[in-house]
Amino acid sequence: MASVNKVILVGNLGRDPEVRYSPDGAAICNVSIATTSQWKDKASGERREETEWHRVVMYNRLAEIAGEYLKKGRSVYIEGRLKTRKWQDKDTGADRYSTEIVADQMQMLGGRDSGGGYGGGYDDAPRQQRAPAQRPAAAPQRPAPQAAPAANLADMDDDIPF
């Protein structure tokens, strides 16, 4: 059976991005994103709120863009996957583990007052170019036979604006 490792976050940066470069020159950017859940407590009737902090890492061009345009407090959309990495504590030498979100896509949200443009979407990897849809040569126009509504749903795909 296929598996899925997909994370989608919409939240606010808790601090300015930290950008560093690996020995081979690849950019690495770490950000901390807060998401907040709100609910009404059934027992007391009070509004409750819980904030969760997420460690997000971006690489290469996506990391450079994040470092340049993102600022503390900025609203952002992140799409990526969970990854747990193993590292050694410098003081004790003990093995440690960190689970973080490796971002594949980033979208800046909010307007100019939020510290940037009107939002720009960025992917870590270049998108695959799709071949343009092949359309048959124009045939002489004939009136289409009247069919019952929703009889052929495949024809409706051409009318969808997205």
UniProtKB/Swiss-Prot annotation:
The record's annotation in Pfam families points to:
SSB
- Spell out the Low complexity composition-biased ranges: 128-151
Q: Which CDD domains does the record associate with it?
A: SSB_OBF
Q: Does the keyword DNA damage apply?
A: yes
State any GO CC term.
Answer: nucleoid
Output compositional bias ranges, type Gly residues: 112-122
User: Which parts of the sequence belong to the SSB domain?
Assistant: 4-110
Which keywords, in A-to-Z order, does the entry hold? DNA damage, DNA recombination, DNA repair, DNA replication, DNA-binding
Q: Mind telling me which InterPro entries this protein's record contains?
A: NA-bd_OB-fold (IPR012340), Primosome_PriB/ssb (IPR000424), ssDNA-bd (IPR011344)
Renumbered ranges of motif Important for interaction with partner proteins: 157-162
Q: Which GO terms describe its biological process?
A: DNA recombination; DNA repair; DNA replication
Provide the residue span(s) of the region labelled Disordered.
108-162
Tell me a Gene Ontology molecular-function term this record carries. Answer: single-stranded DNA binding
Q: Which SUPFAM superfamilies match?
A: Nucleic acid-binding proteins
Q: Which HAMAP family match?
A: SSB
What assembly does the database describe for this protein? Homotetramer.
PANTHER family assigned: SINGLE-STRANDED DNA-BINDING PROTEIN
Function description: Plays an important role in DNA replication, recombination and repair. Binds to ssDNA and to an array of partner proteins to recruit them to their sites of action during DNA metabolism.
Q: What is the name listed in the Swiss-Prot or TrEMBL entry for this protein? A: Single-stranded DNA-binding protein
